[in-house]
Amino acid sequence: MKAEALAQYNTALKAGQKYYKTAVSRGKYPYPLVLDEILPESSIAGYDNLGILEIPTDSVIGTRFAGRKDALAGNFMPLLGPESEFAQKWMRLCEAHLSDEGIRDPIQCFEYLGRFYIQEGNKRCSVLKSYLAPTIPASVTRVIPRWSGDPEIQLYYEFMHFYSLSRLYGVEFRHPGGYARLQAALGFAPEHIWSTEERQSFSAVFSVFQKALEKLPEEHLSHTAAEFLLVWLQLFPFHEIQEVPTNELTARLEKLLPDVIALENERAIELRTEPAGKGPGVLTKILNAVIPEHLDIAFLYSCPPEESTWVRAHDDGRKVLEDRLGSRVTVKTWVRGGKDYGEILEAAIADGGDVVFATDAGMISACRKAATLHPNVRFLNCAVFQPYTGVRMYNGRTYECKFITGAVAGAMTRSDTIGYVANNPIFGTTASVNAFALGARMTNPNARIVLDWACLPGDPVQRLLEQGVTVISNREIVSPSMVQTHFEMGTFRVLLDGSLLPLASPFWDWGELYDKIVRSIFSGDWKTVSGSQAINYWWGMASGVLDVKLSDLLPDGVQSLGQILKEGICDGSIQPFRTRIFDQHGELRNDGSHTLSPEEILSMDWFCDNVDGCIPDFSLLRPEHGETVRVLGLYRDSLLPEAGGDQL
């Protein structure tokens, strides 16, 4: 056993010497960090005795005091020769580790910002590190830093809250919000305290996950295992980690890398606000991109078209696509029925689908999962502001239409009060409310917008009528074919006899959108993007995807104003948010010298000062709206997990 201990020491010594030389050559500190030298006492808010824990070996990076710092390299491998007193003690500990006795006494250490600094037990730690022990028993005292605006300190406070629930080390995020999202992704309520069984189950599976991740190329390992796990849990159940062979698990993790990068990148989403130009672009020609001659296109529906005006509108768009592109495309529709979206997607792909249009936001998870398994298929989902690289999103700038209808409503109201029915509190909805309010104020400086929500129980139009509101903006009409028949949508006036007088109706033309997207694929535009950015098509009225039908019954002046606004928005000379804007709390949101960026517009979570209403709490929504808001909602990251979602 002595010979084995000596051999182990010599191996560890070489590792220590190599680390030391490499660190010195790169101008880095070659010894373990010393906590007392990097942390002034004035930065400490207090201490917390955590008791005896199993701590991650890789997280032990230093010592509490300087001591004899030349005995160990920064990787805790020895630097002194085998004849030294230090080496003799090290080897005796090694013999104990190899015997039935083992190293039983815990080290004593201080934890600061998730890293451990040893006060007693340097050699024990060194021996266990040399054997690649994943954890070390330790008596831990936490050093609590003073709260500050430093992002690292704020993130650590998030970790401390997570630790108070889970009592877990080794789960690391580098950006705010990760711990709360993990708690929710595992199916736990925000303040759920983990049981011993849950902690043990998670640790066992997470260890398998980490080992699979370590097999990725080194350049991919700048992201933490917890960051990869968050993306995994968006697509696959936690237990599946144990059920998949390690090589397959590693392959899946490599395919998730673009989404992991995208989630931490502030500019992860590329909002394409205009359709691609006609014909192959310069970059396509330079790269000699392969341009398809024929495409098999699958449309995925949540129900048959005759059961939903939304699905029927997309089916109308599908027909336009077929009529315009003829033999260049083969188009099939796939209806969910009672099946899982994943099943339908796999069937569509097995049938030869090159392009998949998923027409409902609830299909996002199934599309993302399919995209990791079928990287050569082009997936598009009818949603917006989603940071997923494998699936492109498509939607429209409805706020442009609402600005016009707001101006019409302001001109046509007989009072200063106008009703507005919003659908769901999702990205883009607030911008539409605000654009409508700004349009109304343009023609009626005293206009006030009474906001109600279709996602709440009851009839929002009836509630507005009961308040004496007679001019109301309802939701957009979803297809050109419905403009003449769905007067209850769009903006209308309620007459004395209860009948509706249509004023101006925003409407979608999905056929125009599908035609332009498919033509962009034929032109080679699909490939000319960075793999770490999520592409979201967010087109406006100039693209033809959205328009406003002005009623023939409008006065000539209002009709002319509506036309001028339409033309101005389409040519860019009119920008609804290029004006002085105050919110409901009196905060100046824009001084009028510039317009807001697309990202600022999409992510608005405030209302203009002439809007009376607020974003409804998730708990108040009708159940059928819950799934959409979980996926697209402004506050989706803060929502409680669904009941019964525990994955451990």
Regions found by a protein language model. Give the residues of each.
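Short, charged/polar connector segments at secondary-structure boundaries
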Residues: 1-113, 119-120, 130, 175-188, ...
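A short, basic-hydrophobic beta/loop patch
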Residues: 102-117, 123-155
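Extracytoplasmic "Venus flytrap"
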Residues: 296-316, 321, 332-336, 426-430
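An alpha-beta-alpha
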Residues: 404-444, 532-554
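Hydrophobic alpha-helical segments within soluble ligand-binding/sensing domains
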Residues: 394-416, 507-526
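Periplasmic-binding protein-like
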Residues: 353-361, 380-382, 469-478, 500-508
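Flexible loop/hinge segments that line or gate small-molecule binding clefts
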Residues: 372-395
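Segments of small-molecule ligand-sensing domains
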Residues: 524-647
